């Protein structure tokens, strides 16, 4: 089984910087795309096989 991992900045390059097109592909809000545009290393989000996965932050019960 093969899988692909991308980030929103990678997808923006493929979509010629069109945030609306990336939001349509990921089935999310354009504001969500804008929120993760600066996360080039993928520390707060990743797109695995076309599904957006986000890091929601550290909760009170986690070791951070």
Swiss-Prot record:
A Pfam family: Phage_NinH
Domain of life of the organism encoding this protein: Viruses
Protein family per UniProt: Belongs to the ninH family.
Name used for this protein in its record: Protein ninH
């Amino acid at each position: 089984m093969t899988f692909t991992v991308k980030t929103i900045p990678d997808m923006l390059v493929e979509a010629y910087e069109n945030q609306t097109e990336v939001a349509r592909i990921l089935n999310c809000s354009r504001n969500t795309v804008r929120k993760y545009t600066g996360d080039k290393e993928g520390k707060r989000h990743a797109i695995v096989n076309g599904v957006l996965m986000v890091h929601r932050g550290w909760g009170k019960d986690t070791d951070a």
